[in-house]
């Protein structure tokens, strides 16, 4: 593993986004999504599923206050731990925990989004709200560092007795990520100290050694959270704990058997749902719950980089290749089945029952960025870009007030309402979810999108994503002008002199067949792994100009993807397109796209959004008096009529009411 290839993300404080596209999304999160979600966390959104999140923190704080006051005389009122979700009965609540057992993370993801927003746009009132909420959270923490309201409220004697199912280490992970981000944004360490104390508690209870359990997370995220804590503090113990979780995972005897009193017959492998069916370095196929998987792989990449573990990196590369070449949707969505919110078998990518959870695409972005930190390869950045513009942004309405958990590639509303096999596919975005992992996850990702655009090392500034703004690296400052994702022209101006040769490395998008470049005189130019490296002693004001033409592309799938045979998907630049009923009428399944016909891309403004609409020649089968026709009849050539198909960006679908939608369209010559 060559450390010369390593790079690290720039601090968000060193990147200012002025980009027309992403600045708008970030402002939407700041002005609409963050306040809306704060109301949701406090159960103040009419018609939305309750969160109970802040109520649980306050209730846990009351329990801790009573425990401290009574000391040895404290006797906890205990409640059952046998439900994944607890709801009030007949609208009446008692002192128990309510919601999903991981409900704490609604807040910790929200506060992470707040932190990133404050970095770009200081807001004293928002910071005050976050500070007060942090006090409520920290008031619930035990003196020994434990902080998970599900057990603090219900039964503290049962802590760490069901790591597989009950998400304690998942809650720790999101607490830590939020705490690190908030400290970096504000300099305030109240939540950070709480996260460190919780991490120390975990290290004292889990691992190898007398009195410890050889356990590891059921839902991964603690691994990459510990690595963020390690990167911030330099404390070796956090790297050691992350490495332990990864190394121990999937070893036999299975810890999950031990903690639940089960045995595993010789030769049997299970727990693939948790990516714990075998040691991670022996895994060669992405399996199980898709979000858990990419969170684990992100942590593995972090540990591989920090420890220069070649075997772990090789595993990451193997799993990456299986995922993006055999199990990823054209939108950057992952996880094909609602059963277990999981990956299916290779090339099984159904469109109308797709799961493609918003959180899973976000996790894919995390994984891609971490692989880029080890070595800049355009494939990683291409997938990161694909997921961000499509599989991630589709999870949020244009007004920021409703959300998709699941992101299908084909929707017939009647089927969503009447076919139980598609109960998970919603034809309209929801105000909130009882299991609300996706909305705050999306908010924190959009707020921090600049951290995925650039990485740097001692010699090079890497530009992975193109967005307008300013960048202040350790050795160079630059301003970037970009109209992505609608136009491929990019200019990068050096805003400082360099005393020594320095390199800018620009990703050459995989969707671009050829590109144009205008390079200052005297520069050394090299292409490597899909990046254009430009090296020279820079003078302030020197500019690099690039143009990546965005042609309308009709994509075909691998022939082993059964559902997409004979169909095409439309893509322009990084943006995937879809047909909607609002533009093309009902019965979209009767339409065909003429791949050799005329096609146009035109700027449009609708629903407050500037975008590029694609129009293509098509044909539509005449429906006739179909309801009076026999169910089956002898084949005869279909009667068709010419039509113009109008397509919009996939992330924009379902912002004009309920209706049909298709990404993959039947093709004709």
Stretches with model-predicted labels:
Residues 1-106, 131-151:
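Low-complexity, Ser/Thr/Pro/Gly-enriched N-terminal "stalk/linker" regions
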């Amino acid at each position: 593993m060559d450390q010369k290839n390593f790079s690290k993300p720039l601090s968000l404080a060193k990147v200012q986004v002025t980009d027309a596209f992403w600045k708008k999304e970030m402002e939407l999160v700041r002005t609409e999504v963050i306040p809306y979600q704060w109301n949701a966390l406090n159960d103040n959104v009419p018609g939305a599923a309750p969160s109970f999140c802040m109520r649980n923190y306050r209730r846990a704080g009351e329990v801790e206050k009573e425990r401290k006051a009574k000391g040895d005389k404290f006797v906890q009122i205990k409640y059952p731990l046998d439900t994944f979700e607890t709801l009030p009965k007949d609208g009446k609540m008692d002192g128990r925990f309510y919601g999903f057992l991981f409900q704490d993370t609604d807040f910790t993801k929200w506060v992470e989004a707040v932190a990133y927003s404050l970095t770009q746009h200081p807001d004293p009132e928002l910071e005050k709200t976050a500070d007060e909420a942090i006090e409520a959270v920290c008031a619930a923490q035990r003196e020994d560092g434990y902080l998970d309201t599900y057990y603090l409220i219900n039964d503290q004697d049962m802590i760490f007795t069901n790591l597989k199912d009950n998400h304690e280490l998942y809650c720790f992970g999101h607490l830590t990520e939020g705490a690190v981000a908030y400290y970096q944004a504000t300099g305030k360490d109240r939540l950070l100290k709480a996260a460190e104390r919780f991490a120390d508690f975990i290290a004292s209870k889990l691992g190898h050694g007398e009195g410890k359990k050889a356990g590891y997370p059921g839902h991964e995220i603690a691994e990459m959270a510990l690595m963020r804590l390690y990167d911030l503090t330099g404390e070796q113990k956090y790297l050691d704990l992350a490495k332990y979780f990864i190394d121990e995972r999937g070893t036999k005897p299975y810890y999950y058997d031990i903690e639940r009193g089960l045995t595993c017959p010789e030769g049997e492998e299970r727990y693939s749902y948790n990516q714990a069916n075998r040691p991670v370095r022996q895994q060669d196929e992405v399996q199980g719950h898709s979000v858990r998987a990419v969170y684990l792989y992100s942590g593995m990449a972090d540990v591989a980089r920090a420890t220069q573990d070649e075997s772990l990196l090789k595993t990451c590369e193997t799993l990456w290749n299986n995922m993006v070449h055999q199990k990823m949707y054209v939108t950057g969505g992952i996880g094909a089945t609602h059963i277990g919110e999981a990956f299916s078998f290779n090339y099984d990518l159904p469109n109308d029952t797709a799961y493609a959870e918003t959180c899973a695409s976000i996790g894919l972005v995390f994984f891609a960025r971490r692989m880029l930190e080890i070595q800049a390869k355009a494939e990683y950045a291409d997938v990161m870009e694909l997921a961000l513009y499509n599989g991630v942004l589709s999870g949020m309405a244009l007004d920021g007030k409703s959300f998709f958990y699941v992101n299908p590639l084909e929707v017939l509303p009647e089927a969503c309402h009447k076919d139980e096999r598609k109960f998970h596919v919603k034809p309209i975005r929801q105000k909130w979810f009882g299991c609300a992992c996706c909305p705050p996850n999306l908010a924190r990702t959009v707020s921090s999108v600049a951290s995925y655009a650039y990485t740097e090392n001692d010699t090079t500034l890497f530009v992975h994503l193109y967005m307008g703004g300013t960048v202040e690296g350790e050795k160079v400052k630059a301003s970037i002008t970009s109209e992505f994702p609608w136009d491929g022209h990019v200019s990068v101006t050096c805003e400082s002199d360099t005393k020594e040769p320095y390199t800018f490395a620009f990703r050459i998008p995989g969707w671009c067949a050829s590109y144009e470049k205008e390079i200052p005189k005297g520069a050394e130019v090299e292409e490597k792994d899909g990046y254009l490296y430009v090296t020279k002693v820079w003078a302030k004001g020197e500019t690099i100009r690039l143009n990546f033409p965005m042609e309308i592309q009709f994509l075909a799938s691998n022939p082993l993807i059964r559902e997409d045979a004979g169909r095409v998907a439309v893509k322009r630049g990084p943006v995937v397109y879809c047909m909607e009923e609002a533009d093309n009428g009902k019965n979209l399944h009767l339409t065909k796209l003429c791949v050799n016909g005329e096609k146009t891309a035109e700027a449009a403004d609708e629903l407050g959004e500037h975008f590029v609409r694609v129009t293509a020649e098509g044909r539509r089968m005449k429906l006739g008096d179909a309801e009076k026709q026999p169910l089956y009849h002898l084949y005869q050539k279909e009667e068709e009529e010419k039509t113009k198909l109008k397509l919009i960006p996939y992330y924009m679908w379902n912002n004009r009411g309920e209706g049909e939608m298709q990404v993959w369209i039947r093709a004709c010559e």
